[in-house]
Structure formats: C-alpha cells, structure tokens
Amino acid sequence: MGEEYAIKCDRFTRKFGKLTAVDGIDLRIKKGELFGFLGPNGAGKTTTIKMLTTLLTPTEGEATVAGFDIKTDAALVRSKIGVVPQEFALFKELTAMENLWYIGELFGMKKDELERKSEELLKIVGLYLKKDILTESFSGGMKQRLSVAAGLLHTPEILFLDEPTTGLDPQSRIAIRELTQKLNATGITIVYTTHDMEEADKLCKRIAIMDYGSIKAEGTPHELKEKYGGGHRIELELGPHDEQLLEELKTVANANEVSQENGIVVIHVTSVGGGLIHTISSFLAKKKVKVKEMDITEPSLEEVFINVTSKQVRD
C-alpha cells in the first residue's frame, strides 16, 4: 500500500525575527482531499503555503509533500505541485495561450505536449475562445482561471490555491469554486486557503481553522460544527399548549435550554442526532399539541471560529 498522505507536517514553524508566523503545527492531508485553511488575514495561512511549496524554509520542524522532504528534495516537491498565488503571475502583454506556452517552457515541456496541454486546460477553465486575446483585457475572474490553468500545466499531484476568490465578483467566485470541485473530482489533491466561512463550508472536505499561527481546530465542516458550534436550534410553532410543556420538552429533548421567543418555542440542543426530531414529534403528538412549523438551524462555521478563537472574525 502506498503513502496515504499527500502532505505531512510535524512541529512546522516559521519565525520572522521575534514574530512567530506559524507556530509548531502538526498536519496530515490525505491524497485526493480538498483541504481548506480557514482564518483571517495574518493567521499564518499564506506563510504555511509558502513553506509547503518551498518558497520559504521552516525555522523548525519537518514536512513532506508528495512524499518528498521540502528541505532536502525541494526540486522534486516543485515538480509535483501546482501553485496559484494570491497575486496574478501573468504577463499582460501576452495572450492567454502565450502565457501558458511561456510558463510551460519554464517547466521544460516539449512543444507538442505544451500546445496540446495548453488547449486542453483552456477548455477546462472555460477560456479556449479567449486564447488569442491579450490578458490585459481579462477580468479578475478570467485571470484567476488562467492562473489555475498555468498551475496545472505540468500535471501536478497537488494544487495549492491561495485565496483564489478574493476580490472577485460573485459570478467569478462561483466559477472558481465550481472549477476547484471539478479538478478535485479528477483525483488532484487541493489545498485551499480562504477567510470566507461560507466558501470553506461549501467547498472543503476537511478544514483547519488557523489563527495567530496555530491550528485551533481541524475536521470536516460537520465535525467542527458538532464539536465547537454550540449546538443546534430547533424552532417550533405550536398550537395551544400549557406552560408546563416547555419543561417537559427540555427533559424529553435532553436540551440545554428551552425558551419561548415571540410565540415560537426554541429548543437548544447539542446535537439533533439519534432520532431526536422523531422523539420530539412523537411526544407532541401524544400531548395532542399541533406542530404548525418546525425549523432546525445548525451552527455556522463563523460561530465555530468565534468559539475556538474567542473573538470575532477579522478581515
């Protein structure tokens, strides 16, 4: 059986003078995962990516990427990864196709292979019909999609996307997210950094929440919400009932709290698993209390972030 992990980090640290930008993180990212680093600007996400892509050397700790040590096998690491940085690394005086040809030549790709691969990637990112247009006229979203194509030219095993939707309009953001999911479905491991909670929730299979250089929590979006979100909220609009019902509901639902807000009964529970909704519905049916409407709200990643970092999200 081959190596299970695309990326492994142990005690991964980077200091700039007295400032510790990344503080001894331990991390495992499985092959084929779409893994997200979530956190505000200054959390250490980009510094972590720069170390994993060999642009920065860690002050302490070890890491392997695609099975190679980032310190001793940096060239081999670079041959296995694609990188799409925050800033567009494109030449505005070149066309979309010419940009890819130039970058492919830097990888040492042969002409026939480069032309074939460039056409294939431009079709994948939806820019084939724009291949002969100068990139200076491209929108931010088009430039980002072209940057993704450039990062895929040499068929990497792992693709790093650093804040790829920052500053883009809503349509372009959706296009980049859909492209990311499409690429991940082909088996490419994707490491995705963002400070957008909703984006991370919808896109990433697993997430590491970073702040001040440390990983504060890690897991699937569902796991993070269950563990750190503060519980679910069940709202019930009920028919006529006596005041004692709220206390009975608290016991039946094993609730943290049951209250009434503007005529709506609100049940706060840690989890809605284990047939809880059926239990509540059956109890109310036996009490002959009509349920006019029921709404279940799960905690958001923003609530998770606030709970694990004890503060509001920064820009």
Model regions: which residues?
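C-terminal coupling/interaction segments
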Residues: 272-315
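Preference for bulky hydrophobic residues occupying beta-strand positions
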Residues: 14, 27, 236-238, 267-269, ...
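Generic beta-strand hydrophobic packing signal
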Residues: 10-12, 258, 294
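ABC transporter nucleotide-binding domain
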Residues: 177-270
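ABC transporter nucleotide-binding domains
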Residues: 4-217
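Short, Lys/Arg-enriched, disordered terminal segments
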Residues: 1-4, 314-315
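Conserved protein kinase catalytic domain
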Residues: 78, 122, 225, 305-306
